[in-house]
Amino acid sequence: AALAREGGLPSALWAGPEKLSGAMRRGDAPIQGQRRKAPVHLRLGFADEELGYAIDFGLPVPGLSVFNLDPEIKRECIWLGPVWRPTTAVVDRQGPLVRARGDRGAWTVVADGLGPQDSIFTQLADPRTAPEILLLRERIRAWRFYDHFRTDELAPARQAQLGTRTPVLSADGADLAAALQTIRELGAGEVLDAAVADAFPGARLEVTAEAGRFGLRLAQEGLLRPLGQAELSDGTLRYLLWIAALLTPRPPGLMVLNEPENSLHPDLLPALARLIAAASERAQIWVVAHSPVLVAALEAQPACNRITLVKELGRTALPGKGWLDGPHWVWPGR
């Protein structure tokens, strides 16, 4: 559904030629396509020291269906360790057939007839035959992606909301007040107050609860009364959302922040970098940023690992990096 909303599988694929010749790269020849030789792939994968996973999407075999642009899962693999090899694979899905390796190393068929749009994570979760599927599924589910917080007048974060204990801020920030109060009541009140003071010196944050609905008030130096969440500037509200996300009492294995500098005053970016650096001690944090100020502030933190991306002939690339410069990775074939 997510791919369909953005134009289907073709919108997620490289729109340039299958291969760029040296003459094309130098500008000596026009960039033009050729007859495609390799199958269409959209491949995603990740690995750590314990487990790795890869999925390979492709187009269906042309037929009478009008859904010929729906992606199909051609291959899924789970393996032990950081690099896939046939000997380290523990779960292997090829088309509709799924095999899992048993305790003695022999392969057992655990599913035959899996739908082309169905992942092993949604259809198979037997802890006896393939515990790695269940383990990896729960690990992925715990990841958090914060892409864009709305701050317009109708934004959920600006409205008082029914609240319960909230150890994880929702993606739309609707439970902001409950999330901040949860942080305070679980023993991190001083850390919360310090994060607010680092960005807004002299400010004091208060969570209100009336008839089960939670709201926010922020008292600031120079003002005769605290401001409610509906009155806060876009930047102030968004910064409070980042505080709630990064001070979570339940840190994930991976948290991705997409352009957290949006709507923030440049003076807030050093404080945001310190907040991110502190959170990275409890979770792996990926930050996608375009602000030189935020990037410089993050680089000043000892744990920062900067990866610069550039655009070359329409492609996203790592400048000065070749195939041998990246981490060792092997894609399972079809």
Model-derived regions: residue spans:
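Short, Φ-rich (hydrophobic/aromatic) sequence segments
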Residues: 1-2, 136-140, 180, 240-247, ...
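A cross-kingdom feature that marks ATP-driven nucleic-acid transaction machinery
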Residues: 227, 231-238, 246-249, 256, ...
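Electropositive, glycine-dotted interaction segments
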Residues: 41-43, 47-186, 190
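Conserved P-loop NTP-binding catalytic core
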Residues: 1-62
